[in-house]
Structure formats: C-alpha cells, structure tokens
Amino acid sequence: EERIGRHQLLPFLILAHSNQQVFGFQETRGHWTTVALGPNETVSQLRGHGHVAVAITNERALGFSTYTGGFFGLDWTPHERVLAVDGSQNGMVVRTSSRTVIFKSQSTGWTEVR
C-alpha cells in the first residue's frame, strides 16, 4: 500500500514522496512528474529553493527543476554519505563524504565540483 511521506511546497514547484515514488509539480506548466523508487530505496530528505529542488535517498539524489521538468538522478557510490544539502534560487549543492555535486535549474544533469 502506498503511503505519502513528506513534501516541500515552494512558490514555483512542489516536491513530495511516498514509500513507492517521488512526485514533482511544475507550477508554470501545471504538470506532475513522478519517478519510481527502488524496492529498498527510501527518501531521507526533500530540499528546495526557488526554481529547483532535490530528493535525497539512500541510493541517489534526484534533482527537479521548474524549467526542465522531469527528475535527474545521480547514484551514490557504495560508501558515500550525504553530509549537507544547500540551495540558492537556481541551484542545489549536495556535499557528500567523497564529492560535491550541483544541480542547476536550467540543466538536465548533475555537475561534480572539484
């Protein structure tokens, strides 16, 4: 049975999750998008700011933007741990035990910062 968990409500988007999927809503298009979670995947954080948001799971990060629509995933390595998630109007920064990655509102993927 599907159970709804937390949600993040922002002026331009909504990010929410259940035990089976993550939901993203683009206010500008009036459009919902979903991505399925894996059988052992759980959402630990939902963070957003401005036009961009991210769902953090035990297996990956899922970036969502009001501009590009859809979810853009980044898989974690086996021993990688999320240390911090910070955001600005057009980007989310995720710091892990092994790298820093950025998802920008106008992009269709994650960028690793060295």
What are these regions (language model features)?
Residues 1-12, 37-51, 78-91:
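Repeated scaffold domains used in trafficking and secretory/extracellular systems
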